[in-house]
UniProtKB/Swiss-Prot annotation:
This is Long-chain-alcohol oxidase FAO4A. The keyword Plastid does not apply. Its main location: membrane. Its EC number is 1.1.3.20. FAD binds at residues 224-239. SUPFAM superfamilies: FAD/NAD(P)-binding domain (SSF51905). PANTHER family: LONG-CHAIN-ALCOHOL OXIDASE, LONG-CHAIN-ALCOHOL OXIDASE FAO4A. It is found in: Membrane. It catalyses: a long-chain primary fatty alcohol + O2 = a long-chain fatty aldehyde + H2O2. The lineage of its organism: Eukaryota, Viridiplantae, Streptophyta, Embryophyta, Tracheophyta. One of its GO terms (cellular component) is membrane. The chain crosses the membrane at residues 103-119.
Length: 726
């Protein structure tokens, strides 16, 4: 633990007033606070132990252990562990702070990739914890200094409202429209059985063995027409379609349900509660940081509202090249219209937020095309916190739409906090395998759902694992993973009376309202466009991805948080990866994709400069930046060219992914795909997949409308199966 404390205190050290000049009390307090003074190392250790499930986690353990010895410190730190005084070579924690800073900075660009991984991982988690941890009042000592207000009073808990107006409001008005459709398996067994039976589900409780439960001897058996594993944009839509068609549907969700009244909108808590692995997910080489939802509503609960229809050139490609007739059909176009209408998708906004104003102005100055982004939220929804859940319920994710249809039909229920362990199927010799249901775990207890059809919609990162552990052998399961890799650049706009308005903050306003789709001509590719948009970055994620060159520089960068605009370039990647297990995501950026991302980064830097940023930079570990106002046009051009030409595969920059797809792709032959054009698996009848994993290739834009449209069509296919097979 000494080594971890020393590393955290090096990343975030105490800096006295003399080192920062004249500042007000809140800024002075922020600079003087170290990681250990705020309890950061203990929380970092807990996160690493409980949330970080990475195949190379051993590097952290080994590195921290080595640093606890003088010889290990010599191995990892080299001559910098030499002090010139007996005992000459010292453990990392006994070295002067300045020397420790030099060591960490050396790791960030080390020839050895394991040292770069060690630096990147501990830096990201330390920063994330320091800037997201809160006291009993829900505040963080750094927030005022960096200009972050946290959740506004409008987003506060409903305790007062519940106490004063509980007689005036119905429970679903306070807790959300899924209030009556959630089954809490922590409730008494009799209450669970009563709720299931009340919705028409046959329940049997014939457990024989008192020592534990198993698939052959479960705690409970539940019978239904269809069981859906996953409640996101795929599973939620499929479940809603089936329930409205009159079939009994049970939804199994590994994440928990957070009603509107339970949403804190605190970044750290929301990530821990509603993101896969608490937001601590990355490819096997840690080169790509991955964000994915894990809660009722899935990614639609925490995404950024963009609701873009499948591009015409992608539909044409999937229909002609992949020979999937669905994407050239009227049915698919109707499906897109249906899901957009159900989500209330519209393109307008009453007021545009800081980041999007910057993107729009920069594009207009450069003559680049820029347009409004369709969103599943009303035009007056000026909220930058929807990545942490929508407290007002205005963002129309599946928990506000398709899952509501499920609940209101009286044909469906949702079981949150349940981990599907196996898809069950009949396996009679000489006959085709037929799905018969799903086994799932709630804590240590095993339950079984017996169904006529089974739909797996765990998302592109989890569906392959469930299918593989259920015995499916198709070689395409877990392959062809696309990530829509993203690279970002930043621009600092001081608080001045001139544009952009002084009152606006980087974390406020609609997360996505403007976008630019630009063909990267330099790649000579007809594959698609580079999409340029803005992200949602609250202090934790912001601090996790910005460069670190010293503790003082890092804290100074964070002072600019509220007026630093970020813009990213999203790539429709040609290269693909594989998923071998829950934790092993192998993805190597290919050369062509890397060049496209570099070109995208160049364009983003130019947009920020054109928009009027005083300072611009990227997330490269060197931490270079340029004062645009004092630089000549030649200096700006040279800086943009140099920063955008740096390699992206060596862990020196930062690549992110919020969209994962293609890992069980749809096709017309089992040799090249995992599921049929109907969504049914090649190996098991009545087993369907309905999430982004069925995408034939990368999409190139935000995938919510596309996956919902595909799930809608697959849902109709399942209805046909249920009609035929009574």
């Amino acid at each position: 633990m000494e080594s971890l404390v020393a590393i955290c205190d090096t990343f975030i050290s105490s800096i006295d007033d003399s080192g920062v000049g004249h500042v007000d009390d809140c800024v002075a307090g922020y600079f003087s606070a170290s990681a250990s003074q705020t309890g950061t190392p203990d929380r970092v250790a807990r996160l690493m132990s409980e949330r970080l499930h990475h195949p190379k986690k051993w590097i952290l353990r080994a590195g921290l252990w080595l640093l606890s010895t003088w010889i290990g410190s010599l191995v990892l730190c080299g001559w910098r562990s030499f002090t010139g005084e007996f005992p000459y070579f010292r453990r990392f924690c006994r070295l002067p702070e300045k020397r420790r800073e030099e060591i960490l900075l050396n790791w960030s660009s080390s020839y050895f990739s394991l040292l770069r991984m060690l630096f990147r991982t501990i830096k990201l988690i330390s920063a994330l914890v320091f800037f997201t941890q809160v006291d009993e009042k829900g505040r963080n000592l750094a927030w005022k200094a960096i200009g972050y207000n946290g959740p506004s009073p409008d987003h506060s808990d409903h305790e007062v409202e519940l106490n004063e107006e509980k007689k005036k409001k119905k429970p679903e008005e306070i807790f959300g429209p899924l209030y009556n459709g959630i089954v809490d398996l922590k409730s008494p067994r009799e209450a669970v059985e009563k709720k299931l039976a009340g919705r028409g589900f046959a329940v049997s409780n014939q457990k024989r063995n008192t020592n534990g439960s198993s698939i052959s001897d479960p705690v409970m058996k539940i019978q239904c027409d269809a069981v859906v594993v996953g409640s996101g944009s795929g599973g939620g839509v499929a479940a809603g379609v089936l329930a409205k068609a009159g079939y009994k549907v049970l939804v199994i969700e590994s994440g928990n349900y957070y009603a509107r009244s339970k949403l804190s909108l605190l970044e750290g808590q929301a990530m821990d509660d509603m993101y896969l692995s608490g937001g601590l997910l990355a490819t096997s080489d840690t080169n790509v940081v991955i964000l994915a939802g894990s809660t009722v509503g899935g990614g639609s609960t925490i995404n950024w509202s963009a609701s873009i229809k499948t591009p015409e050139h992608v539909m044409k490609e999937w229909a002609e090249k992949s020979k999937l007739e669905m994407f050239g059909s009227d049915l698919y176009r109707e499906a897109m219209d249906v899901v957009c209408k159900r989500m209330g998708v519209q393109c307008g906004f009453v007021e545009e937020g800081f980041n999007n104003e910057v993107l729009r102005k920069g594009c207009e100055k450069l003559g680049l095309p820029v347009k409004n982004i369709p969103r599943n939220a009303p035009s007056d929804h000026y909220c930058g916190f929807c990545c942490l859940g929508c407290k007002k319920g205005q963002k129309q994710g599946t928990s506000e739409t398709w899952l509501v249809d499920l609940v209101e039909s009286d044909n469906g229920l949702i079981l949150p906090g349940c981990q599907a362990t196996e898809v069950m199927y009949d396996c009679e010799q000489g006959k085709k395998k037929k799905a018969t249901g799903v086994a799932f775990a709630f804590g240590e207890e095993i339950y079984v759902v017996e169904s006529r059809v089974t739909i797996v919609a765990c998302g592109a990162l989890r569906t392959p694992h469930l299918l593989k552990r259920s015995g499916l052998k198709n070689s395409n399961i877990g392959r062809n993973l696309c990530l829509h890799p993203v690279v970002m650049a930043w621009g600092w706009f001081p608080e001045e009376d001139k544009w952009p308005e002084k009152k606006k903050k980087s974390y406020e306003g609609g997360i996505m309202t403007a976008m630019s789709s630009v063909v990267i001509e330099e790649t000579h590719s007809s594959y698609g466009e580079m999409v340029i948009q803005t992200p949602a970055l609250h202090p934790g994620m912001f601090s996790g991805i910005i460069p670190w060159t010293s503790s003082k520089d890092f804290k100074t960068r964070m002072l600019k948080f509220s007026r630093t605009a970020h813009i990213f370039a999203l790539l429709r990647d040609k290269g693909t990866g594989t998923i071998d297990s829950k934790t092993y995501i192998d993805y190597n950026l290919n050369d062509e994709d890397e060049e496209s991302l570099k070109n995208g980064l160049e364009r983003v830097l130019k947009i920020l400069a054109a928009a009027g940023a005083e300072e611009i930079g990227t997330h490269h570990s060197e931490g270079r930046s340029l004062n645009v106002r004092t630089a000549s046009s030649l200096e700006i051009e040279r800086f943009v060219r140099e920063e955008s030409s740096k390699p992206l595969k060596d862990l020196s920059g930062q690549i992110c992914s919020a969209h994962q797809m293609g890992s069980c792709r749809m096709g017309i032959r089992p040799e090249e795909s995992a599921v049929r054009p109907t969504g049914e698996t090649w190996e098991v009848e009545r087993l369907f997949v309905a999430d982004t994993s069925v995408f034939p290739t990368a999409l190139g834009v935000n995938p919510m409308v596309t996956v919902q449209s595909i799930a809608y069509c697959i849902g109709l296919n399942v209805v046909d199966v249920l009609k035929k097979k009574k």
